Amino acid sequence: MSWIERIKSNITPTRKASIPEGVWTKCDSCGQVLYRAELERNLEVCPKCDHHMRMTARNRLHSLLDEGSLVELGSELEPKDVLKFRDSKKYKDRLASAQKETDEKDALVVMKGTLYGMPVVAAAFEFAFMGGSMGSVVGARFVRAVEQALEDNCPLICFSASGGARMQEALMSLMQMAKTSAALAKMQERGLPYISVLTDPTMGGVSASFAMLGDLNIAEPKALIGFAGPRVIEQTVREKLPPGFQRSEFLIEKGAIDMIVRRPEMRLKLASILAKLMNLPAPNPEAPREGVVVPPVPDQEPEA
């Protein structure tokens, strides 16, 4: 037996450690490999480059409202294919696919609860549901949120993330722009605050209606906000747009929004603003609140 064969016979192959799928993810901006649970604890914000990734509607509302205070509103409302609409795919099939993918009935989730003990109603878009498009159920749930805020005499907060009106519902989708705007007029008459938080992206009919009607319009960093997208505008005007066009930093320079707030600071900032507007005591930033329990980071990172 040669010396090479003797060495080979003494080598015991090790089993390759298997890492469950979904434990690791990659930042869309800087490409950093991130531990999924740690990223969730950081509210989907990259710890390396501060890129704000998209967040599910439920995670956003659970990260905002006090634990144990959340009550969902309008969950019984479901979309219907009244027009029997079909493009490359039947609308009812698109709905079924989106509902299966997101485990949501439609693109807006509404909850009431407390924020540092203060009663509020909050709504958040689920962008993964058909691009967060606004149909009749989104409009109805938003109006339900307004009605609940009026009933409870409390503020309303809405986190927008939408591509605009849902084309599969045609005019019924477009009329939600007027319906939601009219509902907000009642908030104004009552003197109750409505804060609109613009996240990436907020476009089309949503940006042209309730998303820009806040008493205070707050944006997350680098959020794309506008009506038509930059590519469409460039093709229409046949000119190159300036860097950062339609991003929140560009809009605040032009006075289109009121402030930019990082996601980890959003909860306390909203509570502080609303406490002042409602003439209530300032929130205590040291108030205890159970966070997400994060399991230990695995020893091995995924192979590149």
UniProtKB/Swiss-Prot annotation:
This protein's pathway reads:
Lipid metabolism; malonyl-CoA biosynthesis; malonyl-CoA from acetyl-CoA: step 1/1
- Record field: compositional bias (Pro residues): 295-304
- The record's principal subcellular location, in a coarse class, is cytoplasm
Catalytic activity annotation: N(6)-carboxybiotinyl-L-lysyl-[protein] + acetyl-CoA = N(6)-biotinyl-L-lysyl-[protein] + malonyl-CoA
Q: Which InterPro entries match?
A: AcCoA_carboxyl_beta, Acetyl_CoA_COase_Trfase_b_su, ClpP/crotonase-like_dom_sf, COA_CT_N, Znf-ACC
> How is the cofactor bound here?
Binds 1 zinc ion per subunit.
The answer to whether keyword Transferase applies is yes
Asked if Transmembrane is a keyword of the record, the answer is no
Region annotation Disordered: residue ranges?
Answer: 285-304
EC numbers listed for it are 2.1.3.15
Q: Name one Pfam family in it.
A: Carboxyl_trans
Required co-factors: Zn(2+)
Q: Where are the zinc fingers (C4-type)?
A: 27-49
State a single Gene Ontology molecular function.
zinc ion binding
Single GO BP term: malonyl-CoA biosynthetic process
The cross-references to Gene3D superfamilies, in alphabetical order and at most eight, read:
2-enoyl-CoA Hydratase, Chain A, domain 1
Question: Keywords of this protein's UniProt record, alphabetized?
Answer: ATP-binding, Cytoplasm, Fatty acid biosynthesis, Fatty acid metabolism, Lipid biosynthesis, Lipid metabolism, Metal-binding, Nucleotide-binding, Transferase, Zinc, Zinc-finger
The family database entries (NCBIfam families) matched by this protein are listed as: accD
- PANTHER family in UniProt: ACETYL-COENZYME A CARBOXYLASE CARBOXYL TRANSFERASE SUBUNIT BETA, CHLOROPLASTIC
Can you state the subunit structure given in the record?
Acetyl-CoA carboxylase is a heterohexamer composed of biotin carboxyl carrier protein (AccB), biotin carboxylase (AccC) and two subunits each of ACCase subunit alpha (AccA) and ACCase subunit beta (AccD).
The protein's role, per its UniProt record: Component of the acetyl coenzyme A carboxylase (ACC) complex. Biotin carboxylase (BC) catalyzes the carboxylation of biotin on its carrier protein (BCCP) and then the CO(2) group is transferred by the transcarboxylase to acetyl-CoA to form malonyl-CoA.
Annotated family: Belongs to the AccD/PCCB family.
Name of the protein in its database record = Acetyl-coenzyme A carboxylase carboxyl transferase subunit beta
**Organism phylogeny:** Bacteria, Pseudomonadati, Pseudomonadota, Gammaproteobacteria, Enterobacterales
Which gene codes for it? accD
